[in-house]
């Protein structure tokens, strides 16, 4: 299935690229989300007519993501969780907990933007967490997990 991308898609292509994907990926993910359109002559002509509009929108989204990344630069948050005396958490601290903690201190963050490379934290301590704010913008923040008896 050949598609024209209307925005940058990680591991696939950039705005305006004509890509070939498996039919299920195109039909069930890219097309319903409005990320791509079928690569027909009519759609190609319509895309070329609106290319400047799509590029301006992509630039605006990138600028907003970079502004958000600047706010997160050097930011840290403390998350408290019940823990044993050895420092093991009775539960875990995951992406949702981290997103809620940053939102509570005035830095709005969604769960899907938090990237935990090795899964949720199960021990108290300091961790560096990657935030994926845009396809081209990432930021690293510090999360301190404190144990509460």
Curated annotation (Swiss-Prot):
GO terms for molecular function: rRNA binding; structural constituent of ribosome. One of its GO terms (biological process) is translation. Transmembrane segments: none annotated. One of its GO terms (cellular component) is ribosome. The keyword Repeat does not apply. The keyword Ribonucleoprotein applies. Keywords: Ribonucleoprotein, Ribosomal protein, RNA-binding, rRNA-binding. Pfam families: Ribosomal_L9_C (PF03948), Ribosomal_L9_N (PF01281). HAMAP family: Ribosomal_bL9 (MF_00503). Belongs to the bacterial ribosomal protein bL9 family. Binds to the 23S rRNA. This is Large ribosomal subunit protein bL9.
């Amino acid at each position: 299935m050949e598609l024209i991308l209307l925005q940058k898609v990680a591991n696939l292509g950039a705005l305006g690229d004509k890509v070939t994907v498996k039919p299920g990926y195109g039909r069930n993910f890219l097309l319903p989300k409005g990320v791509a359109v079928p690569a027909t002559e009519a759609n190609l002509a319509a895309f070329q007519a609106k290319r400047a509009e799509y590029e301006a929108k992509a630039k605006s989204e990138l600028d907003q993501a970079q502004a958000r990344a600047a706010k997160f630069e050097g930011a840290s948050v403390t998350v408290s969780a019940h823990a044993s005396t050895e420092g093991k958490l009775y539960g875990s601290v995951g992406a949702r907990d981290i997103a809620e903690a940053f939102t509570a201190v005035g830095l709005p963050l969604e769960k899907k933007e938090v990237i935990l490379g090795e899964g949720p934290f199960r021990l108290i301590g300091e961790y560096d967490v990657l935030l994926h704010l845009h396809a081209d913008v990432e930021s690293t923040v510090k999360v301190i997990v404190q144990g509460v008896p």
